Amino acid sequence: MEKRHIAVWIGLVLNLIFLGIIAYIPSALEPYRDQLDYQTQQLIEVLPYVKILMTGGIAAQLISLTFPRNQPKLGLIFAMIGGIIFVPLGFIFIVGYLYDYNRVVYSSLKSVPKLAQLPFEVLLKFNKQRQVSMAAMYAVLGVVLLVIGMDFGGIMVAVGIVLLINARRIQYYPMLAIAGDNLLFTPGQYAVCYEAPLSAFTVITDNRSALKLHIRTAELDRVFRIAKADLLQDEQNTLDKILARLKRPSVIQ
């Protein structure tokens, strides 16, 4: 089996532990059934069906790990199904799988290490503060919902934690950058930075909300999207310089 992101294994182990707890509770409480209140008795009745559903979720996660590199989309579908069944814990598995998915899709390109000291002509960074603000908003709202008794708050807290961890990670990668005749780009929140010739890119869409780029090389033909909300507010001029270079890749400014 090929190497996987550590979050995949952590997520899978946590989901298995949770499934074990769900399977154990009914047998542990059955001897005391007559002493339990009505709601707890109803919970004992429902948990076997939850166990079946979660067993299916684990099966979907395991199946997603068996797909070869030439079928990443199909593997991602199973990973999403299996992860969603286990939310909020399932988010850990999903995030790890998204890292692996992007790694496979862009495997033909050269990856750029964190904090790479390259002679950037133009550098566009992610808006870390926006990521942190969103993480805090989800976490605080989730805690409030949990306090008032709404279990959905747990999902929001989990999302907030994932966003916070990723905000710290993403600050070490450029969103877009130009070094020589190459474009460095991070194709998603859960991906690393890659490098390809400027001539391999075509601007598909450039509007107020998003930028879509088409990359075509001998091994890769793909469109990816960059949300402009992830840019710093004063970075439009920097983005314009990058777009100008993409339209005229041989011109050095």
Regions picked out by a protein language model, each given a short descriptive name:
Residues 1-12, 37-39, 99-143:
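N-terminal membrane-targeting/pre-transmembrane regions
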Residues 212-241:
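Canonical phosphoinositide-binding patch of PH/PH-like domains
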Residues 163-195:
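Conserved beta-hairpin
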Residues 4-9, 68-76:
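Membrane-interfacial loop-to-transmembrane alpha-helix junctions, especially the N-terminal start
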Residues 37-48, 77:
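Membrane-interface segments at the starts/ends of alpha-helical transmembrane spans
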Residues 183-184, 192-212:
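Phosphoinositide-dependent membrane-docking surfaces
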Residues 75-83:
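Central hydrophobic cores of alpha-helical transmembrane segments
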Residues 16-31, 44-70, 81, 91-100, ...:
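Alpha-helical transmembrane spans
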